[in-house]
Amino acid sequence: MVFYKVTLSRSLIGVPHTTKSIVKSLGLGKRGSIVYKKVNPAIAGSLAKVKELVKVEVTEHELTPSQQRELRKSNPGFIVEKRTID
């Protein structure tokens, strides 16, 4: 199944109420929030109305919030093998 990965990239400050309601109906809240929506014409129409505010990618699978968090974590560059107690 194919999904749209929708990221809110611009703030909603100063945006008309109708545009805000479209963004809220997509499930986006704060700037940088991410939602996955199944590809269908209704969602595509909503995304076209707010195309200046969102970033859209097409993905094959949906990621859970915990999986998204794991992808954002950086490699610390070391591994703790043994802890010493003082």
Swiss-Prot record:
InterPro entries hit by this protein:
Ribo_uL30_ferredoxin-like_sf (IPR036919), Ribosomal_uL30_bac-type (IPR005996), Ribosomal_uL30_CS (IPR018038), Ribosomal_uL30_ferredoxin-like (IPR016082)
Just give the chief location class.
mitochondrion
Q: Which domain of life is it from?
A: Eukaryota
Which molecular function term from Gene Ontology is one that the record holds?
structural constituent of ribosome
Compartment(s) of residence: Mitochondrion
Gene Ontology cellular-component annotations: mitochondrial inner membrane; mitochondrial large ribosomal subunit; mitochondrion
- Which one GO biological process term can you cite for this protein? mitochondrial translation
Q: Name one Pfam family in it.
A: Ribosomal_L30
* Keyword Protease on entry: no
Residue ranges, annotated region (Disordered):
67-86
Keyword annotations from UniProtKB, A to Z: Mitochondrion, Ribonucleoprotein, Ribosomal protein
Q: How does it assemble?
A: Component of the mitochondrial large ribosomal subunit (mt-LSU). Mature yeast 74S mitochondrial ribosomes consist of a small (37S) and a large (54S) subunit. The 37S small subunit contains a 15S ribosomal RNA (15S mt-rRNA) and 34 different proteins. The 54S large subunit contains a 21S rRNA (21S mt-rRNA) and 46 different proteins.
The note filed under miscellaneous reads: Present with 1200 molecules/cell in log phase SD medium.
Q: Which family does it belong to?
A: Belongs to the universal ribosomal protein uL30 family.
Q: What does this protein do?
A: Component of the mitochondrial ribosome (mitoribosome), a dedicated translation machinery responsible for the synthesis of mitochondrial genome-encoded proteins, including at least some of the essential transmembrane subunits of the mitochondrial respiratory chain. The mitoribosomes are attached to the mitochondrial inner membrane and translation products are cotranslationally integrated into the membrane.
The protein depicted here goes by the name: Large ribosomal subunit protein uL30m
Protein source organism: Saccharomyces cerevisiae (strain ATCC 204508 / S288c) (Baker's yeast)
